[in-house]
Amino acid sequence: MGVVTVPESNKQSVAAKRAFRPSSSIRHTPQWPVSDVTSDLTIEVGSATFSLHKFPLVSRSGRIRKLVLESKDTNLNLAAVPGGSESFELAAKFCYGVGVQYNSSNIAALRCVAHYLEMTEDLSEKNLEARTEAYLKDSIFNDISNSITVLHSCERLLPVAEEINLVGRLVNAIAVNACKEQLASGLLKLDQSFSCGVPETAKPCDWWGRSLPILKLDFFQRVLSAMKSKGLNHDIISDILMSYARKSLQIIREPNLVKSDSDLQRKQRIVLEAVVGLLPTQANKSSIPISFLSSLLKTAIGSGTSVSCRSDLERRISHLLDQAILEDILIPANIGAMYDTDSVQRIFSMFLNLDECEYRDDDDDEEDAVDESEMAMYDFEGAESPKQSSIFKVSKLMDSYLAEVALDSSLPPSKFIALAELLPDHARVVCDGLYRAVDIFLKVHPHMKDSERYRLCKTVSCKKLSQDASSHAAQNERLPVQIAVQVLFYEQTRLKNAMTSGGGTGGSNQSQFFLFPNRSGSGMASGAISPRDNYASVRRENRELRLEVARMRMRLTDLEKDHVSMKRDFVKPQSRRRRYGMLRKLSRGLNKLNAIVLRFRSSQSVASSGKKHTEEKTNSERRFMFQKRRCHSVS
């Protein structure tokens, strides 16, 4: 027989018992041809030994011919054959005239072996090199799926595959065919737009994009770079990158396993940095979801990637911050606190620093088609403008984030204060969410410095608190005294404005009804009461409200005096018992003021119930109540 292949452990040379009889035609059989000529050449390839004949090999292989002439030895060692013993066996069968079946799995190895053994047309017509080249051009380069398979097989054939430019040609073929698929898909969609009821086809990459993740990182990078240079759609590139990242980044699936293996963590870090470097440059216009970018950032921080890689991800997330949810920005920290607030602070800062032109880029192509009158009615800085609505969404996201990280007892107050102070004042319409987060932080961190406590509470705009939040803040003992006084002041100002807008001529009845919609039993809401009675009822209610405002103003004056005296006392050294006594004293004063507010609300309900009293009786009763409360006021 012509060849014997054995493992290295049992390596032995067995001579052919029959000689080789040349054949002018190639036999389409995988078996070796029977020959009566004894083998006269032994070739070792890796762990296998081949007992062959010189004539069929030297007639087609230039390298074997040179080795036989130079060494004049019957034993040759070809340890550097691309593809190992399996590839050499196929090449040897080709030399013996045995038909070799080409496919996408072995064509790259055969092409590299033909180059290594120098099986060119100079030695024999239709040699292995020419035949493999013809198969590549006819069946591989024009099919994107086959090109990916062959390129994957080239990973174990380096550097020979690079020397013959097989890798470069395959990369270019994949990129060109991908662009052709994109063009064909676009033309098909255009054709379908003229017909009705025809479903849209899938994306061009749906059937071959899943094959790209089998490539190693360097080949994958070259393919994606070639696709970008050929003009492939960024959405398709994004889909390919997301598929590759999910299959290649094990840290996303098993973070604990990766952290325990330093070598695996290093490899994952290299893959992650490469994926981030291949992301489309226009992140704000790409189809990459923010959840994917967030997972990459969490992985980057956990695996210790470069600063530039993390900064790039933070910048991309900032462009899509108005689409984020709380889970997207809850980034775990490696050491110290539970969450990485520094990264989140940089993301929000970059969002605020975005140029206004970036918000208007999406509308540049549509401005010519929009009527000028409609554009004149559109206020870019209004509450419904894209920029302002995005800021409102981001402010709600920030409040939710602050409420979550406030539960971390190891978070330094300075970092929490920096986050609370980050957004501008116009970003929030109502500060209830921020107040809730601040209150949680004060409860979890009871030993804060007074200066830090006051600075943190200053971030809450008291005039933007709702009525319920103001009532809670007025009785909140964790807030500094100055903040509590501000809350009461703005609450009194709010009531004063309500009274001012409610008084006046009959033309203000409509606004007064809007301010007090619950008074359905009053003369304004009743159509059976005459205009004269209605006017008298309104005047009576106005007088009652003015009296209540006057009482609250006097009570507020007393509280301000208490505040001034307390500030003077705090400057001097004093015992903790005395300080707590003053706080309790002020708390009792605030509770009494809250009782005044409740009586004020009850007076409204009494006025709306239709009870009619004479002005003399009402004034005397009110005066008596006022004098009684003054006797119990806090000095």
UniProtKB/Swiss-Prot annotation:
Which Cys-Cys disulfides exist here? none
Biological process (GO) annotations? protein ubiquitination
All residue ranges annotated as the NPH3 domain in the record: 206-494
InterPro entries recorded = BTB/POZ_dom (IPR000210), NPH3/RPT2-like (IPR043454), NPH3_dom (IPR027356), SKP1/BTB/POZ_sf (IPR011333)
Pfam families, per this entry?
BTB, NPH3
Which residues lie within the region annotated Disordered? Answer: 604-635
Q: Where is the composition biased (Basic and acidic residues)?
A: 612-624
Pathway involvement of the protein, from the record: Protein modification; protein ubiquitination
Q: Does the keyword Phosphoprotein apply?
A: yes
Keyword list (alphabetical) reads: Phosphoprotein, Ubl conjugation pathway
Q: Per the record, where are the segments of Basic residues compositional bias?
A: 625-635
Location of the BTB domain: 39-104
Residues with Phosphotyrosine modification: Y435
Q: Which family does it belong to?
A: Belongs to the NPH3 family.
* Function field: May act as a substrate-specific adapter of an E3 ubiquitin-protein ligase complex (CUL3-RBX1-BTB) which mediates the ubiquitination and subsequent proteasomal degradation of target proteins.
Q: What is known of its domains?
A: The BTB/POZ domain mediates the interaction with some component of ubiquitin ligase complexes.
Q: Give the protein name, as stated in the record.
A: BTB/POZ domain-containing protein SETH6
Please give the organism: Arabidopsis thaliana (Mouse-ear cress)
The root-end lineage is:
Eukaryota, Viridiplantae, Streptophyta, Embryophyta, Tracheophyta
